């Protein structure tokens, strides 16, 4: 499963014991639109001030394929409307040509939104699945997180540096459906200030190839020459645990760098520590029962002699 395109939470906050103060963006739809426009403008100003060296597209392909991956476009995600999956297929087909061929020369930055641009109905984008405030909803351009998920998974198998990566706030929103990659390696994007960005800190060029078929979103990560190392990404210590009636998905995602010639492990990096609240029916999950101690119990301890 991959997380879908996220949007900032709209509407009033949920009730609490005391009523929290509303944010400006929660006052009304107009206030929300103003807040989004402000964030977009701020991101453009930041990039202009920093003189960010964005990458561009190149039609000619680099010779070496470092990694390939594909993900099923139409998937069953909880009780979401099937037409949102069909609309996502349209959205991915529109965005893929704008990313395909992205060439990262040394020192350059890949920005998903710099490549794709704004997603509007006028451009043909449709209403797809989004995540807002930890809940499934829909918006124009929804589903594009599947593309950044694909790109991120390929980038993890390379020496490229991820400089901006957002998650869905440690929530497990849908049951696994033909999962191909570890939980927690997904992404969250929203035009243009919640971005996915990668910088090339190496001495050679890399290239992203992204395209769609009838069933799959496909990708390749290419380079000028082969790497002397290979990368393995794996989940460890995964489990579902129930604490005080709430089920969480826990685990770790590790990346191991191995020397191709000797087979020796060169480095091991913790990519993600997962502690995600499960928001779907957990009755079929193999849960470990744990009782979290209350404040009084946590405050007790053995006295020093």
Predicted segments with their positions:
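Well-ordered beta-sheet/strand-loop patches within structured domains
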Residues: 18-305
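Compositionally biased, low-complexity flexible segments
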Residues: 5-13
């Amino acid at each position: 499963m991959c997380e879908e395109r996220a949007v900032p939470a709209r509407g009033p906050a949920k009730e609490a014991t005391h009523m929290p103060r509303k944010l400006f963006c929660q006052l009304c739809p107009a206030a929300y639109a103003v807040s989004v426009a402000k964030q977009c403008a701020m991101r453009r100003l930041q990039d202009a001030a920093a003189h960010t060296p964005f990458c561009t597209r190149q039609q000619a392909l680099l010779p070496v394929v470092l990694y390939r991956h594909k993900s099923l476009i139409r998937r069953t995600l909880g009780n979401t409307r099937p037409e949102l999956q069909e609309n996502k297929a349209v959205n991915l087909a529109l965005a893929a040509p704008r990313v395909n061929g992205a060439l990262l020369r040394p020192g350059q930055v890949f920005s998903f939104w710099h490549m794709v641009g704004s997603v509007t109905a006028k451009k043909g984008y449709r209403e797809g699945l989004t995540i807002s405030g930890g809940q499934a909803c829909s918006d124009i351009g929804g589903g594009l997180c599947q593309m950044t998920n694909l790109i991120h998974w390929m980038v993890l198998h390379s020496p490229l540096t991820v400089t901006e990566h957002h998650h869905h706030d440690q929530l497990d929103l849908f049951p696994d459906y033909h999962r191909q990659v570890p939980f927690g390696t997904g992404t969250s994007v929203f035009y243009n200030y919640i971005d996915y960005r990668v910088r090339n800190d190496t001495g050679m060029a890399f290239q992203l190839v992204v395209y769609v078929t009838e069933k799959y979103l496909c990708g390749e990560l290419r380079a000028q020459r082969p790497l002397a190392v290979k990368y393995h990404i794996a989940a460890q210590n995964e489990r579902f645990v129930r604490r005080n009636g709430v089920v969480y998905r826990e685990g770790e995602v590790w990346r191991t760098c191995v020397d191709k010639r000797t087979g020796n492990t060169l480095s091991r990096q913790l990519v993600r520590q997962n502690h995600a609240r499960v928001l779907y029916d957990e009755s079929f999950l193999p849960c470990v029962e744990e009782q979290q101690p209350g404040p009084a119990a946590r405050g007790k301890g053995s006295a020093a002699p």
